[in-house]
Each structure stands twice: as structure tokens, then as C-alpha cells.
């Protein structure tokens, strides 16, 4: 017999983290919060594009930005500084190699910029977070693109394919979303509608059936 499990388990902390509490914990104010990351190794194209957005936020202060550049992206802070922003002098910028408190950071965010892996998308949906998705082109059967398009077609996210990714394109898309609160709220609602928050229970139920325990 075949067993097909499509649901990705969501960490309990993702389901319980609260926006206002998380912002307070992170020392954030009422300005829009952008969270961006490209995975634990980082992604060069994402880092290069995000550097433009981070540098501009450092100069004009319009957004608060949390960005993880990954283990191969240690050149990122230097790139931002070359664009005219001293990260150390900008209280609205939180730039680090890794995010080890993802539930808190994601809860605090108004917009998430990231890849389109299944687990990441499950967490975004569970929290109802609007997203700009940049699918990795280096995966089997282009599955991240298809993952992303499921959210785009549901009105829960926007997409920028890596071949089209530039700092200017990312800034345009970010501004278009964050300057439209009604659109953000609609994206949030649609994302949350897609959420499967009981994946652990579903998987447990299927496994029990396969093992003949029910």
C-alpha cells in the first residue's frame, strides 16, 4: 500500500507567538517590520537584492528590517555599508547570520521575504503572514515555484523569480505591499485560510492506520 503525507508539521511556538509581545521582545516600534532570509546557507541573489532594501531602510528609516544572511553571506554587512548605510548606527536594522528565534521574528513581521520551501510556507500560513516568495531554482522538479504559485493564486503572496530578482524589483514589490494596509490584511487572511495547523495529528493518524493500530 502507498502512504502519501503532504502536510508539514508546524512548531507549537509558531502557533502561539503573538505580534505585539514579539515586537516588544525585539525592541521594535510601530513602523512596518520586514523579515527576510534565504535559508541557513544564505542565498547570494537574495542577499544582493535585500542589501539594497536594507541600505535604503537604514538611510530613510521607513521600515524596520530583520535579515539573516546565512553562513556563506558574511560579506553582506560590508555590501550594505558600501551602499551608504552603517548598520551599527541604525537601530531599525537587525542583521545577523542566523535567526535562532524564528517564531518571535516571524510573529513581529508585517512582511516576510524568503524561499518557498514547504516547511517555511507552512509556518507563514499558520501565522497568516503576507510574503514575497523567491523560489529556489535549484530544486527537484521546480517544486518551490509550484509551492509559491499556490499562495500567489490564493491571493496570499507575491512572487519574484530569481531570474527577475534585483534590488529595485524587490524594493518596488515591498513598497507596493507595505504601503497598502488593506492588501496586506487580505493577504494575511488568505494565507491563514490555507494553514494546516494540525499536521502532526494528521500524520500520527495516518501512521496509526498504516500500522494497523486503528
Q: Across the structure, where does each feature detected by a protein language model lie?
A:
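Short, small-residue-biased leader/transition segments that mark boundaries at the very start
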Residues: 1-5
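Short beta->alpha connector loops at strand-helix junctions that form conserved
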Residues: 6-8, 134-137, 160-164
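C-terminal alpha-helical cap of glycosyltransferases
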Residues: 196-214
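A short, well-ordered alpha-helix in the C-terminal region of glycosyltransferases
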Residues: 183-197
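Donor-nucleotide binding loops and adjacent catalytic segments primarily
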Residues: 19-24, 28-114, 145-149, 153, ...
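Short beta-strand->alpha-helix junction loop in the catalytic core
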Residues: 6-15, 39-43
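Two-component system phosphotransfer/interaction surface
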Residues: 166-179, 208
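A donor-sugar binding/catalytic signature common to diverse glycosyltransferases
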Residues: 102-143
Amino acid at each position: 500500500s502507498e502512504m502519501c503525507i503532504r502536510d508539514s508539521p508546524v512548531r507549537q511556538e509558531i502557533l502561539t507567538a503573538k505580534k505585539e509581545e514579539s515586537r516588544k521582545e525585539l525592541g521594535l516600534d510601530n513602523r512596518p517590520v520586514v523579515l527576510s532570509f534565504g535559508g541557513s546557507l544564505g542565498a547570494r541573489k537574495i542577499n544582493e537584492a535585500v542589501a539594497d532594501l536594507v541600505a535604503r531602510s537604514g538611510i530613510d528609516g521607513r521600515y524596520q528590517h530583520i535579515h539573516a544572511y546565512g553562513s556563506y553571506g558574511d560579506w553582506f554587512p560590508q555590501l550594505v555599508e558600501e551602499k551608504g548605510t552603517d548598520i551599527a548606527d541604525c537601530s531599525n536594522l537587525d542583521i545577523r547570520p542566523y535567526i535562532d528565534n524564528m517564531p518571535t521574528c516571524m510573529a513581529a513581521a508585517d512582511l516576510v521575504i524568503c524561499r518557498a520551501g514547504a516547511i517555511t510556507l507552512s509556518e507563514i500560513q499558520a501565522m497568516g503572514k503576507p510574503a514575497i516568495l523567491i523560489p529556489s531554482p535549484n530544486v527537484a522538479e521546480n517544486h518551490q515555484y509550484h509551492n509559491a504559485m499556490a499562495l500567489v493564486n490564493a491571493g496570499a503572496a507575491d512572487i519574484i523569480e530569481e531570474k527577475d530578482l534585483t534590488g529595485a524589483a524587490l524594493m518596488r514589490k515591498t513598497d507596493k505591499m507595505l504601503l497598502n494596509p488593506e492588501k496586506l490584511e487580505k493577504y494575511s487572511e488568505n494565507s491563514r485560510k490555507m494553514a494546516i495547523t494540525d499536521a502532526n495529528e494528521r500524520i500520527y493518524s495516518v501512521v496509526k492506520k498504516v500500522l494497523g493500530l486503528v
